């Protein structure tokens, strides 16, 4: 079952859900597995939706929002948040592009990374708590769609900007990604339709804001560094989730 294998590859790559690692993954399989990233987002979003549905009747919005954040970090292992911290350590260091890349590669978290994570988590927690307090029927579906859309949006950087390092997991994407760009765009149009069908204009506003922000962010960083890195892909996932909630909130707020 090639499709299930590609979903398996995508799941073990983007999450820390306890699954056995697939054996002998080829470069072609790894590249093609990217088309299953939104399905990985659906699994993550489904878990968050279920948790929200079970928790909100028994806990206040602040507690529910904190537990949702914790669950997402557990399911992903915090790998995307780690990418955000490493990216901010490098980008905010005000060093040369070469030195920024070296800082990103360092596994130790610096002050800029720690502060960025704190601000990010505070903003995301506040948005989730604020949305949950609105009691809108769309809010559970915003939480469901958040990881789905973010796993598509970050691929903008994969398809349209070079990889900054000579080696790394992202390099394999760029060797064969040109032939899949039309499919990638088709997937985006399908997600846009589904977002409007389920979430109407609040979802569309969040989707557009997140997509435009990541497009501009990856374009600017790619020009600065000569390309993107795995850490920046992780940062794009986290930032697109935040921007999605930020864009949807005003259209739901009374």
Curated annotation (Swiss-Prot):
Pathway annotation from the record: Cofactor biosynthesis; adenosylcobalamin biosynthesis; adenosylcobalamin from cob(II)yrinate a,c-diamide: step 7/7
> What EC identifiers does the entry list?
2.7.8.26
Q: Where primarily located?
A: membrane
Which top EC class is named for this enzyme in its record? transferase
Q: Which keywords fit this entry according to its UniProt record?
A: Cell membrane, Cobalamin biosynthesis, Magnesium, Membrane, Transferase, Transmembrane, Transmembrane helix
Q: Name one GO cellular component term.
A: plasma membrane
Membrane topology note: Multi-pass membrane protein
What InterPro entries is this protein classified in? CobS (IPR003805)
One GO molecular-function annotation for this sequence? adenosylcobinamide-GDP ribazoletransferase activity
Its UniProt entry gives the catalysed reaction(s) as: alpha-ribazole + adenosylcob(III)inamide-GDP = adenosylcob(III)alamin + GMP + H(+); alpha-ribazole 5'-phosphate + adenosylcob(III)inamide-GDP = adenosylcob(III)alamin 5'-phosphate + GMP + H(+)
Cofactors needed by this protein, per the record, are: Mg(2+)
Q: Where are the transmembrane segments?
A: 36-56, 61-81, 114-134, 138-158, 197-217, 232-252
Q: Is Magnesium among this UniProt entry's keywords?
A: yes
The compartments listed are: Cell membrane
Example GO BP: cobalamin biosynthetic process
Pfam families tied to this protein: CobS
NCBIfam families recorded = cobS (TIGR00317)
Concerning PANTHER family, the annotation shows: ADENOSYLCOBINAMIDE-GDP RIBAZOLETRANSFERASE
Q: Which family does it belong to?
A: Belongs to the CobS family.
Role this protein plays: Joins adenosylcobinamide-GDP and alpha-ribazole to generate adenosylcobalamin (Ado-cobalamin). Also synthesizes adenosylcobalamin 5'-phosphate from adenosylcobinamide-GDP and alpha-ribazole 5'-phosphate.
Task: Specify the protein name.
Answer: Adenosylcobinamide-GDP ribazoletransferase
């Amino acid at each position: 079952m090639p499709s299930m294998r590609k979903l398996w590859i995508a799941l073990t790559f983007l999450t820390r859900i306890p699954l056995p690692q697939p054996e002998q993954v080829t470069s072609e399989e790894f590249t093609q597995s990217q088309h299953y990233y939104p399905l990985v987002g659906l699994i993550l979003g489904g878990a968050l939706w279920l948790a929200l549905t079970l928790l909100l009747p028994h806990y206040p919005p602040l507690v529910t929002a904190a537990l949702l954040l914790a669950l997402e970090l557990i399911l992903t292992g915090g790998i995307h948040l780690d990418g955000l911290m490493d990216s901010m350590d490098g980008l905010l260091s005000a060093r040369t592009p070469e030195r920024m890349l070296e800082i990103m590669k360092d596994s130790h978290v610096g002050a800029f990374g720690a502060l960025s994570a704190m601000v990010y988590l505070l903003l995301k927690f506040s948005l989730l708590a604020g949305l949950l307090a609105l009691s809108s029927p769309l809010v559970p579906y915003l939480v469901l769609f958040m990881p789905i859309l973010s796993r598509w949006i970050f691929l903008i950087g994969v398809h349209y900007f070079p990889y900054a390092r000579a080696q790394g997991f992202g390099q394999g994407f760029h060797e064969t990604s040109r032939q899949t760009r039309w499919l990638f765009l088709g997937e985006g149009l399908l997600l846009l339709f589904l977002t409007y069908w389920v979430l109407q204009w609040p979802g569309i506003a969040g989707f557009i804001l997140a997509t435009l922000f990541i497009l501009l962010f990856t374009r600017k960083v790619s020009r600065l560094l000569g390309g993107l890195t795995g850490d920046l892909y992780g940062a794009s996932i986290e930032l697109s989730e935040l921007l999605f909630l930020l864009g949807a909130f005003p259209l739901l707020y009374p």
